Amino acid sequence: MIRSDMTILDILCDHQETQEVFRRYDDVIGECVMCNHMFETLEEFCSRYGLDSTRLTAELQAAENN
């Protein structure tokens, strides 16, 4: 299960199907999430950009379950 206290790297390593979700956020933040934020937790990443961590976690979990 994906949690907001996990790093982006851990999520991608365990759940490769989440790559598309992170790619969608590249346009939102104006840079590559998977290039620049691999060692941040989802909470840290969302806090940095004012994103809804609950929503992002839900999107990642949906990708994980599909």
Question: How does the language model describe each region?
Answer:
Residues M1-E64:
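Compact, charge-rich alpha-helical regulatory domains located at protein termini
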